[in-house]
Amino acid sequence: MRNSPVSPGPGYAPARGSERARRRGVARWLAYVGGVFAGAWLATQLYYAVQIAMWSVFDPGSSAFMRADAWRLSNAQPATTIRHRWVPYDQIARTLKRAVIASEDADFANNSGYEVDAILQAWEKNRARGRIVSGGSTITQQLARNLFLSGERSYIRKGQELIITWMLETLLDKERIFEIYLNSVEFGRGVYGAQAAAQYYYRIPASRLSAWQSARLAVMLPNPKYFDAHRGSPYLAQRAGVIARRMGAAELPASQ
């Protein structure tokens, strides 16, 4: 008697179909989640771009860094206040403008917001240390970070910083970028902008800063809270002398 062919048994085909359905479900879920993240990312970039475009006409009230610092200070010392007062570009001494460029970004007037060599050097230093310790930041990159981003050090934040830098350089002219920078950068504990710094350290308006005063303020920028607390630092005086000698060669951005 000839045996009948053995069937795969009940449930075999449905099991394969169930596996395919499960994979399709996972793929759809991943596509949905990816779409949500992509949409949120694009919305964030649009928000940044709109804000920057508005600042071609309106002055920023405060920066993300300033607001975060105000929150930290209010928790640590409730009596501490943020010192900040916006002044137009032409009311900031040319000596301070030249000193900041000489100290922070000598090619600011001509670069595109990035210094590739500095970024590569920072990358090598970070790779050697196994963590982010340097960013190779131009004035525009510093402004991008101060206006919108947290103090966190990560490659994701650095990537966002580069995107915002491109937006700033595309939507604003160099003089406007520098004006916003000088009015929002930190000069000490709770001290933001050229006017507040001039009044806090020298009891004068930003328009009357001397070359030596400007050089000292510019040297404070990489570590303002430290130098606020150590104003007699020999390094501060020595470095200010170096910057004072370089100021004459510093090129200011052209007026538009």
Swiss-Prot record:
Residue spans crossing the bilayer: 26-48
What biological process terms from GO does the record include? cell wall organization; peptidoglycan biosynthetic process; regulation of cell shape
Q: Which GO terms describe its cellular component?
A: peptidoglycan-based cell wall; plasma membrane
Say if the entry is tagged with keyword Phosphoprotein: no
* Reactions mediated catalytically: [GlcNAc-(1->4)-Mur2Ac(oyl-L-Ala-gamma-D-Glu-L-Lys-D-Ala-D-Ala)](n)-di-trans,octa-cis-undecaprenyl diphosphate + beta-D-GlcNAc-(1->4)-Mur2Ac(oyl-L-Ala-gamma-D-Glu-L-Lys-D-Ala-D-Ala)-di-trans,octa-cis-undecaprenyl diphosphate = [GlcNAc-(1->4)-Mur2Ac(oyl-L-Ala-gamma-D-Glu-L-Lys-D-Ala-D-Ala)](n+1)-di-trans,octa-cis-undecaprenyl diphosphate + di-trans,octa-cis-undecaprenyl diphosphate + H(+)
* Xref: Pfam families: Transgly
Q: Which family does it belong to?
A: Belongs to the glycosyltransferase 51 family.
Q: Which SUPFAM superfamilies match?
A: Lysozyme-like (SSF53955)
Alphabetically list the UniProt keywords.
Cell inner membrane, Cell membrane, Cell shape, Cell wall biogenesis/degradation, Glycosyltransferase, Membrane, Peptidoglycan synthesis, Transferase, Transmembrane, Transmembrane helix
- List locations, semicolon-separated: Cell inner membrane
Stated membrane topology is: Single-pass membrane protein
Task: Give EC number(s), comma-separated.
Answer: 2.4.99.28
Tell me the superkingdom of the source. Bacteria
Q: Any keyword Aminoacyl-tRNA synthetase?
A: no
Q: Pathway involvement? A: Cell wall biogenesis; peptidoglycan biosynthesis
Q: What's the protein called, per UniProt?
A: Biosynthetic peptidoglycan transglycosylase
Entry function: Peptidoglycan polymerase that catalyzes glycan chain elongation from lipid-linked precursors.
Q: Which GO terms describe its molecular function?
A: pentosyltransferase activity; peptidoglycan glycosyltransferase activity
